[in-house]
Each structure stands twice: as structure tokens, then as C-alpha cells.
Amino acid sequence: MQLLTEKIKKALPPLYSSEDIPCEDKQVIVKFFNPLGSQTWEIVEGSEQLDGDWILFGFCDLGMGMPEWGYVTLRQLEEIKLPMGMGIERDICVN
């Protein structure tokens, strides 16, 4: 599954553009999840880097009981290899 479509890339506000907006008012643009676990990444901002990778900012819950706002790169999400040949998925009901 393509995690970032062209439509999503265009919809993502640049990094730091919503830093004056309270966390509870930020709009989730795309949500990623582990289909075999409880990890989720609710992304609100992102910027493409010179190497073609994306730095994404959002609410990250790694399933350890301590969700937090933070950064993840698209490459990091794409490199997560799960059993049965699966990987991180994009929630098609968001955006």
C-alpha cells in the first residue's frame, strides 16, 4: 500500500505550521496503523526533505501506554516489516 498519495502530500500542512493551534484542535490528515498490533500514527503535518523522504509530525501511540506528539519519517514507517509479509497500513477512512 502506498502510504503517502499525491492527494495526501498536497493536503499535509508544512512542519511547524500548526504549532500555535492547541493539540486538541489539530486536524489529522492521515492515519497509519500496524494491522497486527496497536501502534498508530495520526499525522497532522509533514514536509518533504531533499533526499525525497518525508518528516511527519503527529500523535504517535506505539502501544506502550504512553502516546505522545512526535516525529516519524515516511522511510521509518515503510521499513517496518511485520509477520506474513505485512507492513504499516494507511487508514483509508481518514482523509
List the model feature ranges, each with a label.
Residues M1-N95:
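Catalytic phosphate/metal-binding cores of nucleic-acid and nucleotide-processing enzymes, i.e., regions
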